[in-house]
């Protein structure tokens, strides 16, 4: 595109995380400036100049590599202002552009010797050990310069491919090879460190190994078979992603953008810096020292020790503390490596990407709302007025209550009855989403119809608690408002709490009464021994219907556990009842009265039931009436 102000919009199907090749790592950091100069390699451990407070060239904050630290201004100050956009200063080599490029431009460190990636070496499982079919302990011995490994046995009869040799064993074999009477023509080749590991990984033909393993699996059983399956699974993943095993050994290390590992000047003139800068500095110092030792052809033992120290420095940068001693800074505090920044609850993914703050959302403590219906939740007025503010403003203007947005906001701040009336109209039929972290399954976020309540706590129906794994001991929940009509429809149709009764994992009901509800049901239907059973026909305790009993209870003429006679023509089951009536009376009108222990049944001459009075408690009447009422409505 000719105009750099125009932005292109990229659409992605998916994001894939895979191993980066050494060339890709170089491509991330390498750039060709408009004048043809190639920049990107960080070669100096310095950060900023203590006198000028400007970044050092080729250092960890280099303006030539990462971009200018001030908008439209080069390092030396020759070019200032936006009119010089895109020019590369011929004096300092800095491109004149915006300083925000320092948030995404990367660099790289070219390593003087290959180093193993600690994630693939010391992770669980160790992919390097699985691919090479060598125990992890032996792989570590090779990488950290404790043992040699045979890369090519040559003509030596006692040596085998991938065999480990100690220093003394290799010296003995060397004496044997270079003896005057030696008959060995093809000398064996051994290696040590990450270079040897890289050679072993390069020698792997994944397709051939996969074929051999598949043949071997058919004839093996038990633990051996499980081990082969684990190995073939790793190999298949490498083949599927077009990744090469030798990429697990690094030849170059990416340097993340400087604004993501800043250096800030404090009031006293001192500097606070990100731990990553210290870790990068250790790597660069050791890398430069190793390059210098190789240049002057230093003794092998010194070079090898420096390579091991470089390996440990890179390990600490990627994942401090995974292997060996943890690198500490001031006050014996462990330095925060790249892995520490990414992983865990406070890491980049969970804290900043998945757990980021969004508009039209709120958060509050939950309390029980026993009078709510299952698909309802109590939303505090204070929260609702804030969440639904754009809708309320729109309706206030549309109803000509106010003329503009500013006046609407002033009116909303007063929160008078007129605003509350409009808010009530807005939230009617507008579902909201409630989410409780951690959202471990799809029922961790459900839709509810909001009901305005006082206070500052969200009210939740007790039946939906098992799905959220919530209780009322201080749990908090987040509220989200679906804005688009499609989102509202989806929330109502698919996510409403009353539509999510079965667990997606087991298919069994997840909406089950528990704790307070079970206790309440028991208390409601329990029999109290200190209440006397009344005589049948007593005016105070005989009622014509279940509704009459409930009216009397609400009128406080009856207590919850008091015995009453109530007319009920439905089926009655009672374990304490006898098989036959205690007594049968013939009445004057030809009807018959059966006297049972807990009921009175009256039949006509054709044995049809005329009326039935049941002796029960007020609590049991309430329970039965509630169930009958709910069933009849469905």
From Swiss-Prot:
Residues that, per the record, bind Mg(2+): 471, 473, 475
InterPro entries cross-referenced by the UniProt entry: DNA-dir_RpoC1_gamma (IPR012755), DNA-dir_RpoC_beta_prime (IPR045867), RNA_pol_asu (IPR000722), RNA_pol_N (IPR006592), RNA_pol_Rpb1_1 (IPR007080), RNA_pol_Rpb1_3 (IPR007066), RNA_pol_Rpb1_3_sf (IPR042102), RNA_pol_Rpb1_clamp_domain (IPR044893)
Catalytic activity: RNA(n) + a ribonucleoside 5'-triphosphate = RNA(n+1) + diphosphate
A UniProt-annotated Pfam family: RNA_pol_Rpb1_1
GO terms, molecular function: DNA binding; DNA-directed RNA polymerase activity; magnesium ion binding; zinc ion binding
GO biological process: DNA-templated transcription
Listed EC numbers: 2.7.7.6
Cellular component GO terms held in the UniProt record: DNA-directed RNA polymerase complex
First-level EC class: transferase
Cofactor(s) needed for function: Mg(2+); Zn(2+)
Binding positions (Zn(2+)): 74, 76, 89, 92
Keywords, in A-Z order: DNA-directed RNA polymerase, Magnesium, Metal-binding, Nucleotidyltransferase, Transcription, Transferase, Zinc
Comment on bound cofactor: Binds 1 Mg(2+) ion per subunit. Binds 1 Zn(2+) ion per subunit.
Summary of the function given for this chain in its UniProt record: DNA-dependent RNA polymerase catalyzes the transcription of DNA into RNA using the four ribonucleoside triphosphates as substrates.
Family according to the record: Belongs to the RNA polymerase beta' chain family. RpoC1 subfamily.
The protein's assembly and partners: In cyanobacteria the RNAP catalytic core is composed of 2 alpha, 1 beta, 1 beta', 1 gamma and 1 omega subunit. When a sigma factor is associated with the core the holoenzyme is formed, which can initiate transcription.
Name of the protein described by the UniProt record: DNA-directed RNA polymerase subunit gamma
Provenance organism: Prochlorococcus marinus (strain MIT 9215)
